């Protein structure tokens, strides 16, 4: 008798994606981050659902409802901190996942890569709107500053901002709609993730060598289900360590003060995972230019497949490209640090140099390195 998982219409799909899926035999721990992102999304949806049961999206009661969750709801403090730090874990996994894609040339699967960029934008939008919900000082002022950037769009800018706000400032209407969007977007992310996987399974996974692995495939289960489970345990442990021992390590103390439109915080800054983009935005002294640079800092990922000049797919055997890749990582860390600093000397200059280097590395230096490596290998 044929196994039910191979014949049942629904189980057949699960079987082809998670059990009998042919996978390369040599994929390293860098290939774990996709499943870890799936776990993060599930954690965020469940903790978010329980938070939404007790949260009220009204400017008068939002802050106190968040406090009420921490003080009066059974394990409410844990649910809230798992959700807040779960977002940080989500972005750590996201950046590692994208970094892996760049290093090993996974971006040559252009459909998968482009859906991935769309997912990145959607997750960033969701996280931004979630940060507004507790209605602390940084929630209000972060929302005001970031939404105000749209006013740089010529002609329609001001009208667009007021349309998003639902008034003439970030107020009750804004908070209510942000809550609605923050609730629906994770489900859109889940749907996009399925499309992401659909495109990936059309081609099969890449592997560290960048060489086609059709001649050497192994079943996903049990080999990679066990490997993913180890990743799940490590991620869960790290998240629990964060949530139970240092829940406010990655947050901003200003967000424990209720939102006050009459009092501006000394340093308005987003959560740590947006600081690199925020630093790029601030490094350009023109509003529209800054907004374009901000969008391009993520959208630049879309041109990476077009600028692949090397005859090899992966960077595994390309020392010159490897060096540039790790300089890019260091540059992003520098930008993250600068984004959290006040706008004064020497931080302004460091931010500008790091921003120029970021775009130069991706658009000029890395494609150039590919050509040089081809030349050295006489290809």
Swiss-Prot record:
It is found in: Mitochondrion inner membrane. Its cofactor is heme b. This is Cytochrome b. GO terms for cellular component: mitochondrial inner membrane; respiratory chain complex III. PANTHER family: CYTOCHROME B. The keyword Heme applies. It is a multi-pass membrane protein. The chain crosses the membrane at residues 33-53, 77-98, 113-133, 178-198, 226-246, 288-308, 320-340, 347-367. The lineage of its organism: Eukaryota, Metazoa, Chordata, Craniata, Vertebrata. Heme 1 (or BL or b562) is low-potential and absorbs at about 562 nm, and heme 2 (or BH or b566) is high-potential and absorbs at about 566 nm. It comes from Pronolagus randensis (Jameson's red rock hare). Disulfide bonds: none annotated. Gene3D superfamilies: Cytochrome Bc1 Complex, Chain C. Binds 2 heme b groups non-covalently. Component of the ubiquinol-cytochrome c reductase complex (complex III or cytochrome b-c1 complex) that is part of the mitochondrial respiratory chain. The b-c1 complex mediates electron transfer from ubiquinol to cytochrome c. Contributes to the generation of a proton gradient across the mitochondrial membrane that is then used for ATP synthesis. Heme b b562 binds at residues 83, 182.
């Amino acid at each position: 008798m044929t196994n039910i998982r191979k014949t049942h219409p629904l189980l057949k799909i699960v079987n082809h994606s998670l059990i009998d899926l042919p996978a390369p035999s040599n994929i390293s721990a860098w290939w774990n981050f996709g499943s870890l992102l799936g776990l993060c999304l599930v954690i965020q949806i469940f903790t978010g659902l329980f938070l939404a049961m007790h949260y009220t999206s009204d400017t008068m009661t939002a802050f106190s409802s968040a406090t009420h969750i921490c003080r009066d709801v059974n394990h409410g403090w844990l649910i809230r901190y798992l959700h807040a730090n779960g977002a940080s874990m989500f972005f750590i996994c996201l950046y590692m996942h994208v970094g892996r894609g760049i290093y090993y040339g996974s971006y040559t699967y252009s459909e998968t890569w482009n859906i991935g960029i769309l997912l990145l934008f959607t997750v960033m939008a969701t996280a931004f709107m979630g940060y507004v919900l507790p209605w602390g000082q940084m929630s209000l002022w972060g929302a005001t500053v970031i939404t105000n950037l749209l006013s740089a769009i010529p002609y329609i800018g001001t009208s667009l901002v007021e349309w998003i706000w639902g008034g003439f400032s970030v107020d009750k209407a804004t908070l209510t709609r942000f809550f609605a969007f923050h609730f629906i977007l994770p489900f859109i992310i889940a749907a996009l993730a399925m499309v992401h996987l659909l495109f990936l399974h059309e081609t099969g996974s890449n592997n560290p060598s960048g060489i086609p692995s059709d001649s050497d495939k192994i079943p996903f289960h049990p080999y990679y289900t066990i490997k993913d489970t180890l990743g799940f345990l490590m991620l869960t442990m790290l998240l629990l360590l964060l949530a139970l021992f240092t829940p406010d390590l990655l947050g901003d103390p200003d967000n424990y003060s209720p939102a006050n439109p009459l009092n501006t915080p000394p340093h308005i800054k987003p959560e740590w995972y947006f600081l690199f983009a925020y630093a790029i935005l601030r490094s350009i002294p023109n509003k529209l230019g800054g907004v374009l640079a901000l969008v391009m800092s993520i959208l630049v990922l879309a041109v990476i497949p077009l600028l692949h000049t090397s005859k090899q797919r992966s960077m595994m055997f390309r020392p010159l490209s490897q060096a540039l890749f790790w300089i890019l990582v260091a540059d992003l860390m520098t930008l993250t640090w600068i984004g959290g600093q006040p706008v004064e000397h020497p931080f302004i200059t460091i931010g500008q140099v790091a921003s120029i280097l970021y775009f130069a590395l991706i658009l000029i230096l890395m494609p150039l390195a590919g050509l040089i490596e081809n030349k050295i290998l006489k290809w």
